[in-house]
Every structure is written in C-alpha cells, then in structure tokens.
Amino acid sequence: MPYLLSFLLCLSLSPIWPLGDNPRAGDPFIIVNKATNKLAYIDDGKIQKVFPVATGKTNELTPEGTFDIVMKAKDPYYIAKDIPGGSPKNPLGSRWMGFNARGTDGSKYGIHGTNQPSSIGKYISQGCIRMKKNDVEYLFDRIPIGTKVWIVKSKKSFQQLAKEKGAIAYEKANEKVGFFYCNKLS
C-alpha cells in the first residue's frame, strides 16, 4: 500500500500529468524561440533537431503561447495571391502545418516552407514561421495533427524550456518512472 501511495503522489506531482499546455512526455513537441529565430523539434523525450527559422517583422506578428497543429498540407495553395501549390512563386513553399493561434482554424498561422530561403533567420514574416525546404519537409513527415507548438521569446536554452513543459527527461531524484524520477517514500 505505501508503494501505491508513493507512486500516485509522484504521478500527480510529475510534469507528465496531462494538464493544459504541457505535452505528454515522449510525444512530439515543437518550441519556437523568437529571441533566436530557432525551432526545436522534440520527440521521444529529447531534442531531436534544431532549425533556423524566420518569424514576424514585429514582435506582435508571431503570436506567443502554446497552440496545436490542426492542419497539414503538402504543396499548399496560397489564397491571398491565388498562387497554386507547387508553384515556385508560392511563398508558402512545399509544406504547411497550421496551428490554432488567436482563435484561428490553422489557415492563418503556420509553420511552412518559403520561396525565399535567404529570409531564414530574419524577422520578416507576417506572423508565420518560415523554414528551409528540407527542414520543413523533415518536420512535416514526423509530426502528427495535435502536436503542441510553444512559441516563446526567451534567453533560456531549448533544454531548459523543454524541461519546463515536461517535454524532455526530468531528473528529480533516485527512482526512474517513465520520463521523470521520484524519491521513494518508504
């Protein structure tokens, strides 16, 4: 009985308890840091890759917060200027992963490719997150609908940010349970 109580206490205090903005430990998770214009792809409890990105011309254009990927498209159509998917003139590039920022349905804000690779690393978009072609295709192939995206402006490392959200291994003490450690209470 004391072991069961110990386990339940550890579980309820752990960062893997599925609450609000936190991803479930081990699930794919994306962090975009507007301070560095970089995107971290996290899966299986560790940072898999970090990519350079472009974000909004002004700080307000790219929304901050935790959102969900709600839409994915290959060779997306660019409605604003009636440019078909696959066209070299299409500013969305070869992939679109739309997220539900500011009450939208995934068609306004997204992580996408670009037809201007020299824009990567700059503050230049109208609010979306741009990636190089190979990078966006790599990410697109690995994240499912429902993946959490956390957009933040921070001086912290991706390692620190991911630990805050419970997305990577969290070391607390002696006994390993899933993606976190817990002290024995016996």
Describe these PLM feature segments.
Residues 7, 45, 71, 174, ...:
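Generic alpha-helical secondary structure signal
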